[in-house]
């Protein structure tokens, strides 16, 4: 069960603000301020707003962490506080951390490479490697909170956050931990990341903040980068009940598959994603007709969105006609490894509050993407089961089912 949540996103620096803004259809995408984008064909991203790390972490400590790790610590602290989870010498061994990042310390790499080229190897920081590696979000969060249980990191590109939560879910289900602090974090608004994703033609080159990220719409031309972190505290029902914890929702199913097809393009007809959705429903012991809401991967790429729609139709059959399918990336942008964490929060809160966040910028529907995408305005709906999809470069497909 999910007992705590923490978020940093382009539409809010905590869960409450992020969820309220998602339901209002707030657009978190704007001109990039972090770097000078004049040399690039991409000028928009979903950046954090009015966020100062020194409000949360000592300046000296923060300088020894890449942004992706800083974000994870802030969101993890919020989640643990929200869960009222007491991590002490009696409980620490049974509380683990499993937080992923898709690309790790990209900014750290850029800075160190410049130092190496300009001033030689002796000027590279001894903190370079510990700041760079993607597992360091988990490492630093476990140190910060004192959690000594199962500890690791999953890296599956854009599926990272969802895979991380799925793996943590299985750790708790097996009885290897009473609680896990889990999710995803990412800080990709850097020169190398923007240049690299631009070179692979994955990013939108549209400079209009209202139309750059428009999942399932005609004219979509790529995703818009976002940054932040989404962290959950999940624990066994017994553990939550024993301490009288507030329960948001239950994770009941997890499916993960590989396309074995192409490094960036999805398999034809969304075959791999379809199998992951089916695996998650099988794990939950439910059928397509049982699911009311699906938080789609929906990144606003021409091929990706269409393939996901085909995968949903192939998996759900007739039930797809009655399924609500929204892409919250229309508001947040694509947070890469963090996106599964944020979207798990949206999925759980949609169940708790009986509300679905919309797909904004839905003004020119693609006739081939003919699902109910909850256009432009939030909707009220009693939800028994919600699903969240994440599909990553490398052919990674991860799906969670919430109750």
Curated annotation (Swiss-Prot):
<dbReference type="Pfam" id="PF02801">
    <property type="entry name" value="Ketoacyl-synt_C"/>
</dbReference>
<dbReference type="InterPro" id="IPR014031">
    <property type="entry name" value="Ketoacyl_synth_C"/>
</dbReference>
<protein>
    <recommendedName>
        <fullName>3-oxoacyl-[acyl-carrier-protein] synthase 2</fullName>
        <ecNumber>2.3.1.179</ecNumber>
    </recommendedName>
</protein>
<dbReference type="GO" id="GO:0004315">
    <property type="term" value="F:3-oxoacyl-[acyl-carrier-protein] synthase activity"/>
</dbReference>
<dbReference type="InterPro" id="IPR014030">
    <property type="entry name" value="Ketoacyl_synth_N"/>
</dbReference>
<dbReference type="InterPro" id="IPR000794">
    <property type="entry name" value="Beta-ketoacyl_synthase"/>
</dbReference>
<dbReference type="InterPro" id="IPR016039">
    <property type="entry name" value="Thiolase-like"/>
</dbReference>
<feature type="domain" description="Ketosynthase family 3 (KS3)">
    <location>
        <begin position="1"/>
        <end position="403"/>
    </location>
</feature>
<dbReference type="GO" id="GO:0006633">
    <property type="term" value="P:fatty acid biosynthetic process"/>
</dbReference>
<dbReference type="GO" id="GO:0005829">
    <property type="term" value="C:cytosol"/>
</dbReference>
<feature type="active site" description="For beta-ketoacyl synthase activity">
    <location>
        <position position="297"/>
    </location>
</feature>
<comment type="pathway">
    <text>Lipid metabolism; fatty acid biosynthesis.</text>
</comment>
<dbReference type="Pfam" id="PF00109">
    <property type="entry name" value="ketoacyl-synt"/>
</dbReference>
<keyword id="KW-0443">Lipid metabolism</keyword>
<feature type="active site" description="For beta-ketoacyl synthase activity">
    <location>
        <position position="158"/>
    </location>
</feature>
<comment type="function">
    <text>Involved in the type II fatty acid elongation cycle. Catalyzes the elongation of a wide range of acyl-ACP by the addition of two carbons from malonyl-ACP to an acyl acceptor. Can efficiently catalyze the conversion of palmitoleoyl-ACP (cis-hexadec-9-enoyl-ACP) to cis-vaccenoyl-ACP (cis-octadec-11-enoyl-ACP), an essential step in the thermal regulation of fatty acid composition.</text>
</comment>
<keyword id="KW-0012">Acyltransferase</keyword>
<feature type="active site" description="For beta-ketoacyl synthase activity">
    <location>
        <position position="334"/>
    </location>
</feature>
<keyword id="KW-0444">Lipid biosynthesis</keyword>
<dbReference type="InterPro" id="IPR018201">
    <property type="entry name" value="Ketoacyl_synth_AS"/>
</dbReference>
<keyword id="KW-0275">Fatty acid biosynthesis</keyword>
<comment type="similarity">
    <text>Belongs to the thiolase-like superfamily. Beta-ketoacyl-ACP synthases family.</text>
</comment>
<keyword id="KW-0808">Transferase</keyword>
<dbReference type="InterPro" id="IPR020841">
    <property type="entry name" value="PKS_Beta-ketoAc_synthase_dom"/>
</dbReference>
<keyword id="KW-0276">Fatty acid metabolism</keyword>
<dbReference type="InterPro" id="IPR017568">
    <property type="entry name" value="3-oxoacyl-ACP_synth-2"/>
</dbReference>
